[in-house]
């Protein structure tokens, strides 16, 4: 028996819709007789724009409403930016597919007056816009002379704030800029020795109801094996550290032949402490590599850094 209809839950932001439309089009190409519909909605993270993401403090800021649609039987799948999807999913839901990763780098975007600068040459006191604690902590560590200011809203809104002079530059995900047609605004891809990217950054995660084999069979055409293995290691690293989307944890992964290399980082919010290391192993042991690296960093003080952050958030 085949599946006749597939309902996709999605955030309604411009980037989310670009990503979801891509998933729909790819699935439609492989399954031309399948009726595919999209239900777009706003999530808590989309609605609360006057508070820094870290202060809202909910791991499912951009996913809970989509997950509710699936659990209520109103959608078969949900499309997420994988970096927004918590590592522990609600009972009854699974991560059914991870798509091929786009460039996971962080990107520097500047306004007209700062075109002559790279990140490393920005003048003292330059205002850097970011909503990510991970980017904030790493950049404070390397460039303590810069001023960091929270920025919220969709990509277009953020670019408008930059161009109006509210910020000297922004740090955004390169993949999001490319998907929205703003690749020309990427002034510099930030090197990984300065900023490790977020877990899952650049990849899409498709969540679905567990036990729905027909849905999983349909999603197989979008699964990208090497991206999936890399993200499995990254997500197990994050899970073992008990971190969410709004913690200063960064990663980098690569696969050479059958060897998976995972680099991980935990930093304090003031930028004064940064713990970083690399773990290598067989691709077949991706999850174990992530767990082992997390425990190594814990042994070097990462646990204490994260506990301070969690305690501050609870206060």
From Swiss-Prot:
Residue stretches in coiled coil: none
Listed A to Z, the keywords are: Chlorophyll biosynthesis, Porphyrin biosynthesis, Transferase
GO CC annotation terms, alphabetical: cytoplasm
Catalytic activity field: 4 porphobilinogen + H2O = hydroxymethylbilane + 4 NH4(+)
List the cofactors: dipyrromethane
Cofactor-binding details, from the entry: Binds 1 dipyrromethane group covalently.
Asked whether the keyword Transferase is assigned, the reply is: yes
Q: Tell me which InterPro entries the record gives.
A: HemC (IPR000860), Porphobilin_deaminase_cofac_BS (IPR022419), Porphobilin_deaminase_N (IPR022417), Porphobilinogen_deaminase_C (IPR022418), Porphobilinogen_deaminase_C_sf (IPR036803)
In this UniProt entry, the residues modified to S-(dipyrrolylmethanemethyl)cysteine are 245
Q: In which pathway does it act?
A: Porphyrin-containing compound metabolism; protoporphyrin-IX biosynthesis; coproporphyrinogen-III from 5-aminolevulinate: step 2/4; Porphyrin-containing compound metabolism; chlorophyll biosynthesis
Return the PROSITE patterns for the record. PORPHOBILINOGEN_DEAM (PS00533)
Biological process terms in GO annotation: chlorophyll biosynthetic process; protoporphyrinogen IX biosynthetic process
| UniProt GO MF annotations | hydroxymethylbilane synthase activity
The lineage's top-level taxon is Bacteria
Instruction: Please indicate if the UniProt record lists Chaperone as a keyword.
Output: no
Top EC class for this record: transferase
Report the EC code(s) recorded for this entry. 2.5.1.61
Q: Which NCBIfam families does this UniProt record tie to the protein?
A: hemC
Q: Give the multimer and partner information.
A: Monomer.
Q: Please state which protein family the record places this protein in.
A: Belongs to the HMBS family.
Further information in the entry reads: The porphobilinogen subunits are added to the dipyrromethane group.
Q: Any idea what job this protein has?
A: Tetrapolymerization of the monopyrrole PBG into the hydroxymethylbilane pre-uroporphyrinogen in several discrete steps.
Name it: Porphobilinogen deaminase
- Species name for this entry? Prochlorococcus marinus (strain NATL2A)
